[in-house]
Amino acid sequence: MKQLIECVPNFSEGRDMTIIKQITDEIEKTVGVKLLDVDLGKATNRTVVTFVGTPDEVIEAAFQAIRKAADIIDMSKHKGEHPRFGGTDVCPLVPISGITMEETVKYAHKLAERVGKELKIPVYCYENAAFTEERRNLANNRAGEYEGLAKKLEDPHWKPDFGPAIFNPRTGAIAIGARDFLIAYNVNLNTTSVRRANAVAFDIRDKGRPVREGNPVTGKIKKDDNGEPVYIPGTLKACKAIGWYIEEYGIAQVSINLTNLSITPVHVAFEEACKSAQKRGLRVTGSELVGLIPLKAIMEAGQYFLRKQKRSLGISEEEIVKIAVKSLGLNDLKPFNPKEKIIEYLLEDSKEQKLIDMTCKGFTNETASESPAPGGGSVSAFVGALGVSLGTMVANLSSHKAGWDDRWEEFSTWAEKGQKLKDDLLILVDEDTRAFNKIIEAFGLPKDTEEEKKARTMAIQAATKTAIEIPFRTMENALESMTILKAMVETGNPNSVTDAGVGALCARTAISGAFLNVKVNATGLHDKTYREEILSRGKELEEKAIILEKEILLLVNEKITRK
């Protein structure tokens, strides 16, 4: 899975779009990141910017944005309602996919160190990036705000984590942190009553509801020995919620903020709201996602509802997303477009023409054209994807077969493995063509000087190695798929045994076809040790595939004969 992090810097300027545009231009200049949102606040005189990308590129874009803000925002002239202590006030990093919080913290520290060292701005690390418990809370770091910063920096206790303990009236200070993804999520109710919506909110939110003396609604709030209100905790951790009425929709909602999806996922919050609403004579009609959501959160929701139905989880990503959207009622108030609401989908390059997005006819015509790519490598990967798809189909049919209800999880597991291999092989369809194009590009490099010749040779060798590794991965994935195909012949729906057999033929063809590509590309490799090793491993994989193919076809023919 590709590593993605989100960055949400807050800049102390919300009235002059020309200033903000200069900052966001720096972000958009960085290859590998995508600017998702720019939210200007005039009253607060503050702008929240959201962008996403691969880790190194994100912290590069963040640094350039902070640098530009330091040049063009003068904090000595800033006025606004929101608490702040710097031109770039806060800059949190948020893990989205393929990366842990611990890894994200390291990137936050890397960014903080560079900002302090190169820009000479005092940096405080907060949330998960904090070095002390006291500094975990952003409010503690920002206490005193800009107006009290000069005095704060004189206090050794508040020495910055990075950068000088010197007050710069123009830039102020900055808080850089790492936090979990925040989800703003509203659950729709079939009522206009804010009081009833609040009752549901108090049932589920972490904070819960205040204890009252006498009447549970109007009674005096009970307080502890310190004079603080006493609360009965709600059912969900890392969840904030309140009830409100939305005039635009004419309904009451439970407005929810989920602060840690690993503790309380979206689908759990939805289900808990449904339970509370039903208990109070209300009905949840659907829900609304405010802002963006990681693909993982939507996939987990879809998989949860499939498990609840005792249905196979081994279906396509698109189908799982569709199940999640339908089950959560995300289309209740307005159409929900996954391409616009799921972060990973927003990052996809819509301009790139992928082979796997073509129709069958289009792909076939492209292969038959005078262009040398797609060639045997891409076709082998595609044939492999078709082969494992047949095995996955048999697993799904078996999972839903009448009388086999107690075996649905067994076949669902096989189908999930098949879907993963299918997706990997489909990626390799385009990767193989890209690898071929890289070789062509390398051969086209200039070779007039000795230095250019050396650089060209190195580029050709690197591209050739990639062009070997891609079809080799096709071989590995296709061979792994044959385990699924054999299992489906042995234990799957007997009515689909020939489908699994055809899948085995496809898988073995994919392996032999990909190995031809490995062998032909290996002839141009200078690294003899690597060449011999990869050819030896490839031969071993092909031999295993041939044996497995014979075993599977023997079983298929035996089962056909018995009918």
Residue ranges and their predicted role:
Residues L111, I121-C125, E134-N137, S481, ...:
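Preference for long, well-ordered alpha-helical segments
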Residues I5-P9, I356, C360, P372-V379, ...:
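Disorder-to-helix initiation segments
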Residues F382-V383, W414, L421-L428, A467-N477, ...:
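Amphipathic alpha-helix face/heptad-repeat signature
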Residues A65, F363, S389-M393, A435, ...:
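Amphipathic, well-ordered alpha-helical segments in soluble domains
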Residues H400-P446, L541-K550:
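A structural-propensity feature for long, helix-poor, extended segments
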Residues M1-G362, S369, K447, A455, ...:
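Long, contiguous binding/interaction regions
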Residues F181-I183, D432-L505, T509, N521:
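Amphipathic alpha-helical interface segments
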Residues C7-P9, F85-P92, N260, T367-V394, ...:
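Conserved phosphate/anionic-ligand binding catalytic regions in large, soluble enzymes, centered on
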